[in-house]
Amino acid sequence: MTRKYFGTDGVRGKVGESPITPDFVMRLGHAAGKVLAHGASTGQGRPTVLIGKDTRISGYMLEAALEAGFTSAGVHVLLTGPLPTPGIAYLTRALRLSAGVVISASHNPYYDNGIKFFSADGDKLPDEVEAKIEAALEEPMTCAPSDDLGRARRINDAPGRYIEFCKSTFPNSQDLRGLKLVVDCAHGAAYHIAPHVFHELGADVIAIGNQPDGRNINDGYGATAPGKLIEAVREHGADLGLAFDGDADRLQVVDSEGRLYNGDELLYLIVRDRMAAGFAVEGAVGTLMTNMAVELALKRIGVEFVRAKVGDRYVLEELNKRHWTLGGEGSGHLLCLDRHSTGDGIVSALQVLAALRRSGKTLAGLLDGVSLFPQKLINVRVEKGFDWQSHAGLKAARAVVEPELAGRGRVLIRASGTEPVVRVMVEAEHAETAERAAQTLAEALRA
């Protein structure tokens, strides 16, 4: 499907520039409302949507615009205020609502924002519904008669409901007593959620990145900037550090030694724990960028590994296609579909903590069978429209390099989607091998 407005993760951009303007977002809400109202005319009753947001200052403006758009189309609106993206997915499903909407740009700076939709089941909106919304955007905006306008109200118990849901994904037989955790909320949507979840399960919690001011989301804190977390873990002598991004769908973990563990390693750990608990795990899904050491480690324990395109949307699609439950990305998007319908940083952290409790081991101990392969990435600038896939010199160089890796490394070459650059990535057991192979391929491209 060719999308005019919807990208792989909703509608996103810089605030004040198309399409993230108040007038467009109001029209987007109205168009989505018309699509939902049409579905309701087939006997489902008047539709109600849930709207949540992260802590960006533009969230107030865009929330008001969405509210106006939906209610003008005859759709009722429930407003949660700041709440993690996966919390909106959960509550949409739990409250039996028609759809959920999140105002967030995830890990991006505060001056970006976006609109993301969830279906009634808490899943991403189907492509055909996105297509209907885009078609409705091309129609004139007509307000419903006064008797048919929607109502809007705030729900005050949304944080508490979501906190209890998160806790329900942690084994009843376990608690977190005796653990000291540093929790970095990125000054984002988890600031008033994550610390409570871990505290109520018994942990001693030191919260950082939990003072949002509308402009500091993801600024020097959170999953994309773990430096402050590493410092705090060492300063407080904590057992672990947990970092979430602005909308709390990503997770990065730091151990007591200050070592950072990414999503690839955490995916392997969760798979191993499910197996240790007696659950069958047929396979797991990563992406084109997942470290090969994780793929090989999973194969050693009899778990099939499949690579999807980069993006949690594509990981989810592959999991659903194969009826598997576990997948993720190195960035920290982890999917545990036996616990939640979408990626959830807090729920993922609880799965990691459950594995530590069940095993009695440290993170390093649980992952001693996985030593990530070194990666070498070289960006080669090319002319716009350059056809690297037909480049004879690159093909010849690849024919030499790949046999040398002998199944203990890999080559990934792809064009950037945003600039005239071809990215050459080589992964190998030894850094020198990766460096040499990447340079060979890059030089062939430049020739």
Swiss-Prot record:
Binding site for Mg(2+): 106, 245, 247, 249
PTM characteristics: Activated by phosphorylation.
Cofactor requirements of the protein: Mg(2+)
Molecular function via GO: magnesium ion binding; phosphoglucosamine mutase activity; phosphomannomutase activity
Cofactor annotation remark: Binds 1 Mg(2+) ion per subunit.
Phosphoserine found at: 106
Catalytic residue positions: 106 (phosphoserine intermediate)
Keywords in alphabetical order: Isomerase, Magnesium, Metal-binding, Phosphoprotein
Protein's UniProt keywords contain Thylakoid: no
Pfam families assigned: PGM_PMM_I, PGM_PMM_II, PGM_PMM_III, PGM_PMM_IV
Catalytic reaction equation(s): alpha-D-glucosamine 1-phosphate = D-glucosamine 6-phosphate
Gene3D superfamilies found in the cross-reference section: Alpha-D-Glucose-1,6-Bisphosphate, subunit A, domain 3 (3.40.120.10), Alpha-D-phosphohexomutase, C-terminal domain (3.30.310.50)
BP GO terms, sorted: carbohydrate metabolic process; peptidoglycan biosynthetic process; UDP-N-acetylglucosamine biosynthetic process
InterPro entries for the chain: A-D-PHexomutase_a/b/a-I, A-D-PHexomutase_a/b/a-I/II/III, A-D-PHexomutase_a/b/a-II, A-D-PHexomutase_a/b/a-III, A-D-PHexomutase_C, A-D-PHexomutase_C_sf, A-D-PHexomutase_CS, Alpha-D-phosphohexomutase_SF
EC number per UniProt: 5.4.2.10
GO cellular component terms given for this protein: cytosol
Origin: domain of life: Bacteria
Known function: Catalyzes the conversion of glucosamine-6-phosphate to glucosamine-1-phosphate.
Family indicated by similarity: Belongs to the phosphohexose mutase family.
NCBIfam families: glmM, PRK10887.1
Protein name: Phosphoglucosamine mutase
Gene source species: Cupriavidus pinatubonensis (strain JMP 134 / LMG 1197) (Cupriavidus necator (strain JMP 134))
